[in-house]
Amino acid sequence: MDPSVKKDEIYYTILNIIQNYFIEYCTGKNRNFHVEDENTYIIVKNMCDIILRDNIVEFRKDIDRCSDIENEIPEIVYDTIHDKITWGRVISIIAFGAYVTKVFKEKGRDNVVDLMPDIITESLLSRCRSWLSDQNCWDGLKAYVYNNKKFYYVTRYFRVAAFIITSLAVINLFL
């Protein structure tokens, strides 16, 4: 635990989402109604689930390589975000933390399981507190997801429009 990390509103806002996700990932019990911001929780959960599905083998290798993983988390967080902080990287750190927590739970290391949400939260805040503050904490994630969805839909509509125009042009050729 890092005593230099300020335990303020940002800390507890981030911890609330991380802690509940870790519990849900380890137990399989839905935690949507235990969080302060259900919409953010669902976004984080869905993104983490995708990352875990796609990267579970790499996460397992990372855990096998480290002899003292719980003490190496701050360094792993630093290595992940030292050159650039993005929501994808922040969510990847949370997903990795959830996986590590589940491994510890399976090994019966409950003392570390209870500390993992705090370790991840502190590691994130010690490296990117100002960025998270500038993002207005989880509101920045919601805006990021909303803007990406808008871009996805606009791109999709352009493709559909292009397909329709092409189809009409082809039909016109045969008439």
Curated annotation (Swiss-Prot):
Gene3D superfamilies: Blc2-like
Record-level GO cellular component terms: host cell membrane; membrane
Quaternary structure and partners: Interacts with host BAK1 and BAX as well as other BH3-containing proteins including BIM, BID or PUMA.
Keywords: Host membrane, Host-virus interaction, Inhibition of host apoptosis by viral BCL2-like protein, Membrane, Modulation of host cell apoptosis by virus, Transmembrane, Transmembrane helix
Protein name, per record: Apoptosis regulator Bcl-2 homolog
Membrane topology field: Single-pass membrane protein
Locations listed in the record: Host membrane
A Pfam family the protein falls into: Bcl-2
UniProt-listed GO biological process terms: regulation of apoptotic process; symbiont-mediated suppression of host apoptosis
Bilayer-spanning residue ranges: 152-174
Major site of localization recorded for this protein: host cell
Described purpose of this protein according to its UniProt entry: Plays a role in the inhibition of host apoptosis. Interacts with host proapoptotic factors BAK1 and BAX to supposedly prevent their activation.
Organism per entry: Canarypox virus
